[in-house]
Amino acid sequence: MVKPGQILRAAVRETAEPLTELAGDSVSSAGRVSAAYHAIRNAIRTNVFPPGYQAAEIEIARQLGMSRTPVHEAMARLQEDGLVRILPKKGIIICALSPADIEEIYEVTIALEGAAASRLAMIDAPVKAEVVALLRDATEAMVAALERNDLPGWAAADERFHETLVACAAQ
């Protein structure tokens, strides 16, 4: 069972707003839903919530330090994404990816990133050098994380690499 506050330490690192601010009135309802969504998604991605993990809405809300309403809405979004299944009156259960899901994800990723790399190959040399430097930084961060046996750090650097590749190709 996940200890109270474990999400705060492990899963919220990528949330745009600190969750301590979410209890205040200054953050919109949409901001709270987004923060809950990203925190839970990150907990799934980092295996804080592994496949098969079951949690009640109130338990997750308590861990995030927010009311049930944004957590409820975040869970609905996560179910639409196929990451969780809502169990009426019980909470959620984390879905496992099937081998077919993983294969499809990689096929789409390869197609998109191949097109992005082709597009980047056509840009002006000075801009290309900047993009290469960003990609090199992300790659070096991945290597450093592996040397420290830091899987979450490696995943964050890997995500930064892929996001940089696609974002720079889109400009």
Swiss-Prot record:
Keyword Cytoplasm on entry: no
InterPro entries according to UniProt: GntR_C (IPR011711), TF_FadR/GntR_C (IPR008920), Tscrpt_reg_HTH_GntR (IPR000524), WH-like_DNA-bd_sf (IPR036388), WH_DNA-bd_sf (IPR036390)
Pfam families in the record: FCD, GntR
CDD domains noted in UniProt: WHTH_GntR
Coiled coil: none
Domain of life: Bacteria
Record protein name field: Uncharacterized HTH-type transcriptional regulator in the TAR-I ttuE-ttuC' intergenic region
